[in-house]
């Protein structure tokens, strides 16, 4: 029984330490302590009023719960006092340093050594700033790169390479489909009796007609170009008529309205 009481006290101290360590000043604020104290007093009063109705085993468990709550409250109270004492010490140190500086300056005026006192104070401040900055620089330079940070950087680089490779593969496949449409267009025009002065006009006109299709999302681009190549030259392909317009715009007068697809 006594060992269990000691164990619960240690467990409460560990829980309170967790609050103070990871939750900061919010875990030991004055409001939280007051709320916890009210709950503790309420638990004690409730236990005293119901003690006569409880059995022996239930009474022992209630005692243990109260010991745990009291230990937790005492540790939180200790953390709150230490935090307040640290703030008070910092304020006292600041006031002391300010008083010391004012006292030193006034003594210099009385002794007609104002310049020497001012120079001494400025020199000391510069020395403190230089030492602080040099300490920060040396610590940042000598600090090794964390292993986790290097691993994350390598993982991001690998992911970037993988995405770049996938994009390059999709782009290459779409370019092949576009080249297949150029060959298909040349065959269809030849079947309809169209002879172009410059065979490269087919490629130029088709690239102009397919300009907006390259703006499709990368995930849907290959499938979109596959459908275009399959339906190219038919009424189901909405890029054939713009292709004819571009051919005519390039000066191919053999291409006329009868080559459009309804």
Swiss-Prot record:
Cellular localization per UniProt: Mitochondrion membrane
Broad class of the protein's primary localization: mitochondrion
Highest taxon of source: Eukaryota
Cellular component, GO annotation: mitochondrial membrane
Residues in coiled coil: 152-181
Keywords from the UniProt entry: Coiled coil, Membrane, Mitochondrion, Transmembrane, Transmembrane helix
Ranges annotated as spanning the membrane: 4-24, 28-48, 62-82
Cystines in this chain: none
Alphabetized InterPro entries for the sequence: Mt_uS3-like (IPR052694)
Other facts noted in the record for this chain: A stretch of 270 kb of the mitochondrial genome is duplicated within the centromere of chromosome 2 resulting in the duplication of the gene. The expression of this duplicated gene (At2g07777) is demonstrated.
Protein name as annotated: Uncharacterized mitochondrial protein AtMg01090
Organism: Arabidopsis thaliana (Mouse-ear cress)
């Amino acid at each position: 029984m006594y060992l269990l009481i000691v164990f619960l006290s240690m467990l409460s101290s560990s829980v309170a330490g967790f609050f103070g360590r990871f939750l900061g000043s919010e875990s030991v604020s004055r409001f939280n302590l007051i709320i916890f104290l009210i709950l503790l007093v309420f638990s004690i009063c409730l236990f005293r009023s119901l003690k006569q109705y409880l059995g022996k085993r239930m009474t022992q468990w209630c005692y243990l719960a109260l010991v745990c709550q009291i230990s937790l409250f005492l540790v939180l109270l200790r953390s709150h006092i230490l935090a307040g004492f640290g703030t008070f010490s910092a304020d006292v140190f600041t006031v002391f340093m300010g008083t010391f500086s004012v006292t030193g300056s006034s003594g210099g005026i009385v002794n007609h050594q104002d310049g020497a006192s001012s120079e001494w104070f400025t020199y000391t401040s510069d020395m403190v700033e230089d030492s602080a900055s040099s300490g920060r620089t040396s610590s940042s330079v000598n600090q090794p790169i964390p292993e986790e940070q290097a691993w994350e950087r390598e993982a991001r680089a690998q992911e970037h390479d993988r995405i770049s490779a996938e994009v390059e593969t999709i782009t290459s496949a779409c370019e092949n489909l576009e080249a297949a449409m150029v060959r298909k267009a040349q065959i269809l025009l030849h079947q309809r009796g169209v002879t172009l002065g410059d065979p490269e006009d087919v490629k130029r006109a088709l690239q102009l007609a397919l300009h907006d299709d390259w703006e499709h999302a990368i995930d849907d681009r290959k499938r979109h170009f596959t459908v275009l190549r399959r339906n190219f030259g038919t009424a189901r392909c909405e890029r054939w008529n713009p292709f004819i317009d571009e051919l005519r715009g390039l000066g191919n007068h053999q291409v006329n309205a009868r080559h459009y697809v309804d």
